[in-house]
Amino acid sequence: MRWAIVRFPGANCDEDARFALEKAGIRAEFVWHTERDLRGFDGVFLPGGFSYGDYLRAGALAAKSPVMEAVRRFAEEGRYVVGVCNGFQILTEAGLLPGALLANLNLHFTCKEVGVRVERNDLPFTRLYPRGQVLRLPIAHGEGRYYADPETLARLEGEGLVVFRYAPLKDEADYNPNGSLHDIAGIVSEKGNVLGMMPHPERAVDEVLGNTDGLPFFLGLVREVAR
């Protein structure tokens, strides 16, 4: 299995993504943002960071990069695309996922571990998690507040397109770290092949760091190929 990790100027989670994919047994290769051909890859990973310095809006300039034309074709063919943090922002700016990621309600960059509940486990990314499991995953963003108009929110909820939702790790009342509507932490496309999420599963895959809650996310992709 061979995945492309897109490197945008300002991205800083590309090495984390490579480590996580390779730990799961997936061959990972870096692809520069000027690339126009993604043939030969089984999946595409858009990593976190600050692409183009977050000028205009987070992900706005990266969404216009040449590689995104290839990513769009890749997604339209039904192949897997994952965007984490800035990658999620890029997917919404490119129109590959609905909604937008706005500034956190506290107007601060927030970096901590949060509770993330698995809403669906019938996708390659989540099939190794029990539905309803609350994961402990890191976040690190200043613009992670998911927003969509009421009609879009109703469609996301009605069609089961919300995959991850912020949830209490213990009994804390302020578990939503950024003010995302409906506590949304991650969504998927109607075809189920394009996933965007703000928490970082790739930063929770190693026992040395004391947390492997993100590893099944990547192992599920391997299991999908083996089916």
From Swiss-Prot:
User: Which pathway does it operate in?
Assistant: Purine metabolism; IMP biosynthesis via de novo pathway; 5-amino-1-(5-phospho-D-ribosyl)imidazole from N(2)-formyl-N(1)-(5-phospho-D-ribosyl)glycinamide: step 1/2
Task: Recall the GO molecular function terms of this protein's record.
Answer: ATP binding; glutaminase activity; phosphoribosylformylglycinamidine synthase activity
Quote the catalytic residue positions. Answer: 85 (nucleophile), 200, 202
List, for all copies, the residue spans of the domain called Glutamine amidotransferase type-1. Answer: 2-227
* Keyword vocabulary terms for this entry: ATP-binding, Cytoplasm, Glutamine amidotransferase, Hydrolase, Ligase, Nucleotide-binding, Purine biosynthesis
Q: Give the location in the cell.
A: Cytoplasm
Q: What is its EC number?
A: 6.3.5.3, 3.5.1.2
A matching Pfam family:
GATase_5
GO CC, alphabetical: cytoplasm
| Reactions performed catalytically | N(2)-formyl-N(1)-(5-phospho-beta-D-ribosyl)glycinamide + L-glutamine + ATP + H2O = 2-formamido-N(1)-(5-O-phospho-beta-D-ribosyl)acetamidine + L-glutamate + ADP + phosphate + H(+); L-glutamine + H2O = L-glutamate + NH4(+)
Q: Which cysteines are joined by disulfide bonds?
A: none
GO annotation terms (biological process): 'de novo' IMP biosynthetic process
In terms of InterPro entries, this protein maps to:
Class_I_gatase-like, PRibForGlyAmidine_synth_PurQ
How this chain assembles, per its entry, is:
Part of the FGAM synthase complex composed of 1 PurL, 1 PurQ and 2 PurS subunits.
Q: What does this protein do?
A: Part of the phosphoribosylformylglycinamidine synthase complex involved in the purines biosynthetic pathway. Catalyzes the ATP-dependent conversion of formylglycinamide ribonucleotide (FGAR) and glutamine to yield formylglycinamidine ribonucleotide (FGAM) and glutamate. The FGAM synthase complex is composed of three subunits. PurQ produces an ammonia molecule by converting glutamine to glutamate. PurL transfers the ammonia molecule to FGAR to form FGAM in an ATP-dependent manner.
NCBIfam families given for it? FGAM_synth_I (TIGR01737), PRK03619.1 (NF002957)
Protein name in the entry? Phosphoribosylformylglycinamidine synthase subunit PurQ
